[in-house]
Design a protein with these regions (language model features):
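A subset of signal/propeptide-processing and intrinsically disordered low-complexity segments
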Residues: 7, 26-27
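Bacterial N-terminal signal peptides that target proteins for export
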Residues: 2-15
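Post-cleavage N-terminal segment of exported redox proteins
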Residues: 3, 22-24
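Bacterial N-terminal signal peptides
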Residues: 15-22
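Mature soluble binding/inhibitory domains
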Residues: 27-145
Length: 145
């Protein structure tokens, strides 16, 4: 009886593993199609913050409010940054962005370039600067639509 129980137990494990392996591509396809609204998902007022390093200069920290219009454009209303202890505030910086159907994207804020991942409901953006010499990453959280 013990051998029979072990055989059926192993057979069930193998069946579940085969089912999971067969369904995995479908799950990935579903995940890749979560941002079908594309640019429209990135809409409203967001608070963004991040930390990192400017190579050869020192640490950097930023916080700001950005408005995304849902059409690939926006505006950084107010951004305060501290670079190696020197603080400055910038206002009204133009923003352009593209959201892909797999919820990845890219944006330009002024002269800075970023890659990001956005949640399917548009409530959270995780971003990283892609410009050479800057290691800076952070998040953006939607405050209101």
């Amino acid at each position: 009886m013990n051998e029979l129980h072990r055989f059926f137990g192993m057979r069930n494990v193998l069946a579940v593993a085969a089912l999971a392996a067969g369904l995995a591509p479908q799950v990935l396809k579903a995940d890749n199609a979560q941002c079908l609204l594309r640019n429209a998902i990135m809409s409203g007022a967001y608070v963004a913050s991040g930390t990192g390093t400017v190579v050869g200069v020192g640490p950097i920290a930023v916080v700001g409010e950005l408005i995304y219009n849902g059409d690939g454009t926006g505006n950084a209303v107010l951004v305060t940054q501290s670079v190696n202890g020197a603080t400055s505030t910038l206002t009204n910086i133009p923003v352009t962005f593209t959201v892909n159907s797999d919820c990845t994207g890219s944006k330009t804020v002024g002269t800075g370039h970023y890659n990001f991942v956005i949640t399917p409901d548009g409530s959270l953006i995780t971003w990283i600067v892609t410009d050479n010499g800057v290691t800076l990453m952070g998040t953006g959280v939607r405050l209101r639509k």
